[in-house]
């Protein structure tokens, strides 16, 4: 059979649609939302390519409209996790022997299906199941997931081209082989794209996976599997199971063929996973790969020269998009007293224009938090701030779960820099501001550095480039920094 050195198609980012009033995509998406709301979906597990139903039904309800029944999924147990492992290991020999070009073609096809005929269905499923507005859904479950599938192929191509130099008369070669066993993908609710990428990336590289999605993102996970199957993914390569985390962990982490975990979620859960793997290390055929991303206590730091309007925009957009349910969302801000009154005024103006409500109304910028547990955690934090002598709720603070899990975007002013909401992740639409003495920039930067164990994202605002360089150096271990220099 003729062979060749195959060149990939040109890989580019998926364009984002606007969903502006009167646009065809807006009309199509609204129609898809109405269609999904008119039915009660049956959502089975997918093991070895087959739909698995247990009859133990769990309701799927929109977080913003929890009286509406959107669908029901079939709850599994330990036996289904074992079935998924068995199916993955059965599929492994054929999958890992498949040419990389064929594996790449499957995921490129999946990206095209996602961005094409499945686009609005995926948006609608994510919007309804996870309470995302149209724009937040579009950039996540369509554009970012398509980018993951496509750029993973590009990255795989580049990895395979990483080959050693050879001495005269010798041809050295590196073979990038899959892991010995199966990969466990444990995925979050807040990004459909991450949920699809965590099993998708290892599968692309020839691995087989057991995938347990968040119980609040089962609906979109099932649709991802439907797309992958249509794209040609062989049965058993990725197996989708719905069960509790501890149930899955008991089976997965005690199995001799456990080869790796791909995780996004809370820091404490990841710590527990790591400890369990260490405890069981003698059981495994190989050393499991542990890949994970956890929480953040992401900050905004403005120096005395910063532009108040820009800082206010960063606060509102950085803290409240998707209800602050992003590990990269801003949740604490350090603002000097000389610009704080102006910043607060701009924030008040911006937040007065923010609408809170269901995703079906495209003018709602903020929707519901994911579930009752999240609602209770956030409302308790607001109540505690209202009662504390060390903090004050200065904007927002209202909440209501009568129809959906709605938390009004809220800003707390902390009078002490170590107030609890300056340190601990809440994962919701609450940002805490500490107003500091403009003469104590360095001291406040030191407080910022030592206040939280998290180091994910941060933003520094200044009109002085030298200040930005100095602050960036001092905070380089606190986050993946972004700096903002106002040139006007």
Task: Name what the model sees in each region.
Residues 127, 145-146, 154-310:
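Rossmann-like NAD(P) dinucleotide-binding subdomain of oxidoreductase/dehydrogenase enzymes
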Residues 125-132, 164-168, 361-367:
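Short linear capping/connector segments at secondary-structure termini
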Residues 227-232, 254-256, 260, 267-417, ...:
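ALDH superfamily catalytic-core signature
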Residues 67, 88, 103, 206, ...:
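Residue-level signal for inorganic ion chemistry
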Residues 1-70:
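Hydrophobic face of amphipathic alpha-helices that form TPR/SEL1-like repeat modules
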Residues 1-7, 14, 18, 65-71, ...:
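Conserved C-terminal structural/oligomerization subdomain of aldehyde/semialdehyde dehydrogenase
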